[in-house]
Amino acid sequence: SYLLKQVVNVDDIREILFNVSNKIILPSFGNLSNNQISYKNNKDIVTEIDIKVEKELYSHFSKLIKNSKFVGEETYSKDPSILNYYQSDNYCWTVDPIDGTSNFAKSKERFAVMVSLTKNKQIIQSFIYKPIGEEFMFADKTGTFFKNKKIELSVNTTIENSIGSISTKYWDGNKKEKLVAIKNNFKNINSYGSIGCEYFDIVLGIRNFALLSRLYPWDHIPGVFIVRQAGGHDCHFDKLEYKFYENSKNLVVSSSKNLSYEILNLIGE
């Protein structure tokens, strides 16, 4: 079945991301002028570079698989109906051209390019590329790989030893208070300002979890799959795995099922 093989060659993707990074992203890092930065929906910034990178990736990926669909963060801001592509049986690329745009614009190193390939509501392959350091992690049906090694998450962390993020921005009042109240139960709560870089570090055992509210697919499909295929765990509050193809909310992603359930328990879910 098509799920058992790599649909696209990892080296092709790595090369595309490396080239786009060296051609478009890195030359602008630390060199952005204010007129290259704008706001969408009053709070999220977008740079000319995000838009250029997305266009470039679209042109490459549409050639790799004929008739494939494309969901990009910047394309979505012009046409939200593209999320319907997940309901079709076409291959669909999901792209976050620069995850951590704010960091990128402030010359902070934590940002990533994230890509996923899905079909029939299944995630098939995912890729995260960090331009600073040229770090590349990917996952397919056989597992998660970094630096030519298969990564197996074996950390069995408890809440009091856990480091992670709790995004309180989009919860309603009641839940928000609860989330603020539980922060002290963990070893450390902080955010990178790039969820892609957080997922990367959950796989490497540097972090342990992320508790999320608003779920845009380009922010989460790549990283959730990479964590899942490394032996980590993801679930909505109903304990079912992430449904990227629905307008779902509230997700916990962690290094183990036990930790996810402990966190859900703590917030009373």
Please place each PLM-identified region on the residue numbering.
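Short secondary-structure boundary/capping segments
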Residues: 37, 82-86, 128, 136, ...
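An extended, acidic
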Residues: 154-269
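DPxDG-like acidic metal-binding loop motif
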Residues: 84-145
